[in-house]
Amino acid sequence: LASEISQRFETWSSFRRTWTNEKKEIRDYVYATDTKTTTNSKNGWANSTTTPKLTQIYDNLKANYEAALFPRDVNFRFQAGNAEAASIVKATAVQSYMEAKVRQSGFRTTVDRLVDDWILTGNAFATVDYSREFTETEEGEIIQGYNGPTVVRISPYDIAFDPTVAEFKNTPKIVRTLKTMGELHIKALTDPATAEILSKMMKNRSEVGHSGGQTEKSAGFIADGFSSIENYYQSSMVECLTFYGDIFDRSTNTTLVNRLITVMDRAYVVENKPNPSWLGTAAVFHVGWRSRPDNLYGMGPLDNLVGLQYRIDHLENMKADVFDLIASPVLKVKGEVEDFVYAPGSKIILGEEGDVGFLVPDSTVLNADLQIQNIEFKMEELAGAPRQAMGFRTPGEKTAFEVENLSQAANRIFNHKAARFEIEFLEPILNAMLESARREMNTLEIVSQVDNGTGAVFFSEVSKEDITSKGTIVPYGARYFAESARRIQTLQQLVGLKANMPDVGVHFSGLTIAKIIADEVKEPGLFGQNIQVDETLETQKIANDAAVDLEEDQQNKAEAGL
């Protein structure tokens, strides 16, 4: 099994070498400070300035995607699957527990890195783990840390799979991770099987370390990221390949279905067990930015723009070189000319047919600024990030209705991609976190809850039974982002209609409009039924009391002759 899994990882990784090189070129351009580290270095221009247009588009996309995915503190809700789960107690317990774990586990920080992968490579991969963190003090006291589900980023370069399968959840997957020898030593203290394998691994490292020459090993032992097998064995890192899916075991002539198999050093199987997830498939998730036909690897928003970035840098440095030649042109010397000093006021003695002049390049190339501007504008549109989304207004006067229609049309690609990330990626991840908690939770959890009516915060205990109910977690950040803009625009029109047309306004509920406004601005304490009446009465009461006090004070002063 170890050799089979190692060979599959090596084979699947080799099939995507071209894809890996393309992503490296994109990364080079995004983080470049000059053209010397990009493919533009082959142009041969004296200037090597890079215009970071691809970087600006990347930053713009990332900022807008994150604003769309997380427009508010709570960006998901629990949808009950039956009457029992729909009870207020059950639904509130699940919602409160997941809100607490998303907040405590650094979910947003991890998603931030996943959005990076999604934009730069066109693919994001993640899995879910259950963490039990604790710290032991010098006095032996155990301090409990985070206990709950976490989302774990998988680098697009550390996962290999068969991209020809119709759906990602059905394809076998191999995830590569690196562990330290210290982590294995700690596990070996309580696991005899790990201790035995660790002993063999240390022996191999000792033999290779003293061999002094190039040890011939099978391809299954070669670890990615190390220059040689000797360097790998002499390091303190251990490579782990974790296989998810179905595999044929040649040693027993049986097919292992839905297994989780871990291989170390591409030689030792340290874990071989049924997939523990209740979801029925591996808890490894993927989303692509742009789908390819018959290929699970997605295409990124920057893939088609690298050539245009190359063109911008080419024109910019060509223009700079020409400008340098105009400012300091090449000197042309013809015929017999005595040596001279090239300086203001110098005299040049020419022989017969002698001549001195300048070779001035054609200044038409300086008009490249217009071409560069057009290319940059085109790149914005092709990336699905219109200039208006950056705060720049397109030319021309527009009515409010035209502005709304243009905004919706301009952001349609952007909203579609953000909703896809949310539906295909975040939703299964959140549900896998809930499934992991239902399976692994063994203690009571204290979580905070917010009263929607008053905004007050209170705490309650949540048990494993409380969160074990039929239902799903549904994120709605990206969908809320687009819907909220439309709702606020509509509310403004309704409020104006209610004020300007009393005959129509009497049929609109002011109470409902007030509730919606309080919800949209995320201030639950802003709303209270007939609160203005109570506040007016309270203000009037205070004013009346103050008037009585003032009258009594003046009467007392008059009686005292003051």
Where do the protein language model's features map onto the residues?
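C-terminal anchoring/interaction modules
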Residues: 1-49, 111, 118, 126, ...
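Terpene synthase/cyclase
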Residues: 40-48, 59, 246-250, 272, ...
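Conserved core architecture of multi-subunit DNA-directed RNA polymerases
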Residues: 49-54, 58, 116-117
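Generic detection of long, well-ordered alpha-helical segments
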Residues: 51, 84-91, 104-108, 298-309, ...
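Short, hydrophobic/amphipathic alpha-helical patches that form generic packing surfaces
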Residues: 59-67, 96, 100, 121, ...
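Helix-loop-helix transmembrane hairpins and adjacent membrane-interface loops
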Residues: 74-78, 126
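Extended, regular secondary-structure scaffolds
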Residues: 89-306
